Design a protein with these regions (language model features):
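Long, solvent-exposed N-terminal ectodomains/accessory regions
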Residues: 3-282
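Context-gated lysine
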Residues: 22-26, 68, 81, 162, ...
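Intrinsically disordered, low-complexity regulatory segments enriched
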Residues: 63-64, 82, 322, 352, ...
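Extended, non-transmembrane interaction/recognition domains
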Residues: 162-413
C-alpha cells in the first residue's frame, strides 16, 4: 500500500516536471545591428516615398486652382467709383443765313439757356457752330467716337417759325423770321427760346431712359429720379439685350390658302436695310414659315383688348421659343377679316413679337405689314418712339452703351462677391483673363460713351463679364461636401496609414529606449 503511493507520487513529479519543461519559453536571439538598421531603412523608405512623391501628387491633383482676380477694381466698378457715365452730345448749328457774329451770339445764348435748364449733368448738350457752306452728310453722324455730331440744326429763314426733323438724317430744320434773331447786346431771344425748347423735347426721352438706368445702379446722382409712363412702357415692352436675335416671320391661315406669299422680296426691301442699320447693336438671323389650318386662340370678329393675349395659339402653332444662342422675336401675319376693337389690325406683344391681321385679298402686298413689323422691332429693342429713324437709332445706341456698361460693372461686382463668399470655388485662368478683358473694355467704353466705338467696347465688356461669371468649371467642387471627401480617403488611410504610423511610433520608442540604456 505504501509502495504504491510512492510510485504514484513519483509519476506525478515526473509529469509535472515534463509539463514545466514544456511550458518554458525559449528567448529569441538578440537582433543584430544590421537587422535593426534594415528595418529602420524600410520604414523610412516608405515615409520618404509618401512625403516626397505621394503627398505632392495628391496635393497637385486635388488642390483647387484659384486664379488671382483684381477684386478691388471689380468692386470699384460695381460701386460706380471708376466711371460716372456722361454723354456730352454735340449739337452743330448751321446758320449760313446769319452773319458770323450773329451766329456765334445765337450759339452762346442758346448754350446758356440749356445749361440753366439742365438738371441732369450726365446728359449734357454742347452746341457748336457748323462750318459755313458745308453740306450735311450721313458720314458726320457715324465717325464712331464720342466726338461725333448727335444732331445738326439747320436755320432756314421763313415767314413763320416751325421745326421739322429730317426723315433720313439726324437733322432738325428750324424755320425762323428775321425778328427772332438775337441782337448782340441781348442775352436771350425768341429764337433762342424756341431752339432750347425743341432740343429739350427732342432729347427728353433719352434723358429719361439714361436717368432710369443710373438710378437702378450704384452710381450716386445729384438729382432725384421719378418714374414715368415712358419708363414703365419701355421696361415692360423691350426684350432683354442679347448680342444676337433670331427673327421668325410666320404666315398663319385657317384654310389651305394661300400657298405662297412674297416674303423674300418684302424682307429684302423693308427688313434687311433696317437690320444693316442695327448691325452695330446686335446680329440678326431670319427664317420664315407657312402654317395651314391654323386656328387662333380667340375666334371673334372684333378682338377686345383682353383677347389680344389669347389670340396666339401657342399650344398648336409651331412657334419655337428660341433658335440658336439668341432669343427669338416672332412676327405673325394671320389671314383673316377680324380686327381689334377700335379698327386696328395689328398689336405688339411685349417681349415676344408682333401680330398683323391681313385680309386674304391683301396678302400679295406685304408693305404695310413689314412697316409695322419694323416699327415693332425697334420698340422691342428699346428704341424711343419719337423722332426719325437715324435719330432713334443713335438714341438707342447711347442708351444701350450705358445699359451694357452698368450691367458689365454689376456682373464684375457679383463675381468678386462670389469668389470671396465661396473660398472653395475654383477660378480658372480663363475667368481671370475674361475679367481683365472686361475691365479694359470698360475703360474704353467709359471714354467713348456717346459714339459707336463706345457701344462696341460696352458690348465686349458685357460679353466677357458674363462669360467669366457663368464659367461652368467654377462650380464643379462647390457641391462636393467634406463628408464625401472623408469617404474617399478612409479606404486609403486605414489599410496603409495605420500600419505605417504604428510602425514608425514603435521604432521611435525602441530607439529612445536604446538611447536610454546606453546612457
Amino acid at each position: 500500500m505504501m509502495s504504491r503511493s510512492e510510485n504514484d507520487i513519483s509519476v506525478e513529479r515526473t509529469e509535472s516536471s515534463e509539463i514545466r519543461f514544456k511550458s518554458k519559453k525559449k528567448d529569441p536571439p538578440p537582433e543584430t545591428s544590421e537587422s535593426i538598421r534594415r528595418r529602420r531603412l524600410i520604414i523610412l523608405s516608405f515615409w520618404v516615398v509618401i512625403v516626397t512623391i505621394g503627398l505632392p501628387i495628391w496635393w497637385s491633383t486635388t488642390a483647387i486652382y484659384r486664379a488671382k482676380l483684381p477684386l478691388n477694381q471689380m468692386t470699384d466698378w460695381a460701386n460706380g467709383k471708376v466711371c460716372r457715365p456722361v454723354f456730352p452730345l454735340r449739337i452743330s448749328i448751321q446758320a449760313d443765313s446769319l452773319s458770323v457774329h450773329d451766329a456765334r451770339n445765337l450759339v452762346r445764348t442758346t448754350q446758356h439757356a440749356l445749361d440753366d435748364l439742365n438738371d441732369f449733368p450726365a446728359h449734357h448738350l454742347r452746341l457748336q457752330l457748323h462750318p459755313s457752306n458745308h453740306s450735311v452728310t450721313a458720314d458726320e453722324f457715324s465717325t464712331g467716337d464720342a466726338q461725333e455730331v448727335a444732331l445738326v440744326i439747320r436755320l432756314i429763314p421763313s415767314a413763320e417759325i416751325k421745326a421739322s426733323l429730317h426723315p433720313h438724317l439726324s437733322v432738325l430744320d428750324i424755320y425762323y423770321t428775321s425778328k427772332q434773331v438775337p441782337v448782340s447786346y441781348s442775352s436771350s431771344s425768341p429764337l433762342t427760346t424756341y431752339i432750347t425748347n425743341q432740343l429739350r423735347a427732342l432729347f427728353s426721352e433719352e434723358r429719361t431712359l439714361i436717368s432710369h438706368l443710373l438710378s437702378t445702379s450704384n452710381i450716386e446722382q445729384s438729382t432725384e429720379y421719378r418714374t414715368s409712363d415712358t419708363i414703365q412702357k419701355w421696361t415692360s415692352h423691350r426684350m432683354k439685350y442679347s448680342p444676337s436675335y433670331h427673327l421668325t416671320f410666320s404666315l398663319f391661315t385657317p384654310t389651305s390658302t394661300p400657298t405662297t406669299w412674297p416674303i423674300a422680296s418684302a424682307l429684302e426691301t423693308y427688313i434687311h436695310p433696317l437690320l444693316e442699320l442695327l448691325h452695330p447693336i446686335s446680329d440678326f438671323s431670319i427664317d420664315t414659315q407657312i402654317q395651314f389650318y391654323a386656328s387662333p386662340g380667340v375666334s371673334v370678329p372684333i378682338l377686345r383688348k383682353e383677347d389680344l393675349s389669347l389670340f396666339v395659339n401657342a399650344a398648336e402653332w409651331p412657334l419655337s421659343p428660341s433658335i440658336g444662342g439668341g432669343p427669338t422675336i416672332n412676327f405673325i401675319i394671320f389671314v383673316g377679316d377680324m380686327e381689334v376693337d377700335g379698327g386696328a389690325k395689328s398689336w405688339l406683344i411685349p417681349q415676344w413679337g408682333g401680330v398683323v391681321i391681313l385680309p386674304p385679298s391683301e396678302i400679295e402686298d406685304l408693305e404695310p405689314a413689314m412697316l409695322i413689323f419694323a416699327k415693332q422691332l425697334l420698340s422691342l429693342l428699346g428704341a424711343p418712339e419719337t423722332g426719325s429713324l437715324p435719330f432713334r437709332l443713335q438714341t438707342l445706341s447711347r442708351v444701350l452703351s450705358a445699359s451694357l456698361l452698368l450691367k458689365a460693372s454689376s456682373t464684375l461686382g457679383s463675381l468678386a462677391r462670389l469668389s470671396l463668399a465661396l473660398p472653395s470655388i475654383a477660378i480658372p485662368r480663363s475667368v481671370a483673363d475674361g475679367v481683365t478683358k472686361s475691365i479694359t473694355s470698360l475703360h474704353a467704353a467709359c471714354e467713348g460713351l456717346g459714339g459707336l466705338k463706345g457701344l462696341q467696347h460696352a458690348r465686349s465688356a458685357e460679353r466677357e463679364a458674363e462669360k467669366a461669371f457663368f464659367e461652368k468649371s467654377m462650380v464643379g467642387q462647390v457641391y462636393f461636401p467634406d463628408e464625401h471627401k472623408i469617404a474617399v480617403y478612409l479606404p486609403l488611410l486605414g489599410p496603409i496609414g495605420v500600419p505605417l504610423t504604428v510602425g514608425a511610433i514603435k521604432e521611435l520608442r525602441a530607439w529612445i529606449k536604446r538611447k536610454t540604456w546606453t546612457l
